[in-house]
Design a protein with these regions (language model features):
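Non-heme Fe(II)-dependent double-stranded beta-helix
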Residues: 2-36, 43-159
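Short hydrophobic-aromatic micro-motifs
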Residues: 41-42, 171
């Protein structure tokens, strides 16, 4: 596992780990933070029920691919059944951008509220990129994404290209840790 210092050397960046405030969707404070830092973390963007439903819809999508994936059987999550993903988890293909899970997620009130405040309109347009689906590496060490890989990215860097030209959202549906 790379340390922040090693990643700095690999990518010529400085990584600072710090507490980041969680702000209300659609609040003036969230927009001020976004303007100042280039990102914002929205607290309670999804309820527990909305996160669970989104996750269930993603599993429905994966099982409907017809490759033999079964959400209840991790033995079916191997590469021969799992959709091809970039960097171990980024899935931009297979119609995932138009999946029921993605449309459900885009329609969640706090998600819409956050973007409506950013763009100062309720008339929102969306792109149809992909999703990132990482399998639990504690079940198979080959599924682990090593720190320092370029899997996690943003399309608009807040320092080299400031302003609001390409605002992306990221939603964790399961608990995460620094590991």
């Amino acid at each position: 596992m790379h340390t922040g210092e090693e990643m700095s050397k690999d990518f010529n960046i400085e990584i600072e780990y710090k507490h980041v405030p969680r702000l209300d969707a659609g609040s003036d404070e969230s927009i001020s933070y976004l303007d100042e830092h280039g990102y914002v973390v929205i607290k309670n963007a999804l309820s527990t029920e909305e996160a669970k439903k989104t996750l269930d819809l993603l599993w429905d999508y994966l099982e409907a691919l017809g490759t033999g994936i079964d959400r209840n059987n991790p033995n079916t999550w191997d590469d021969d059944k799992w959709p091809t993903c970039a960097h171990g988890g980024i899935m931009p293909s297979y119609g995932i951008g138009h999946s029921e899970a993605q449309w459900f997620l885009r329609g969640i009130p706090n998600v819409k509220k956050a973007f409506a405040k950013i763009w100062d309109t309720d008339e929102l347009l969306t792109s149809f990129d992909g999703v990132s689906l990482w399998r639990p590496w504690n079940l198979n060490s080959e599924w682990k994404t090593e720190s320092g890989q370029a899997w996690f990215h943003i399309d608009q860097h807040p320092i080299s290209k400031p302003g609001k030209q390409c605002i992306q959202g990221l939603v964790n549906l399961l608990p995460t840790s620094e590991e």
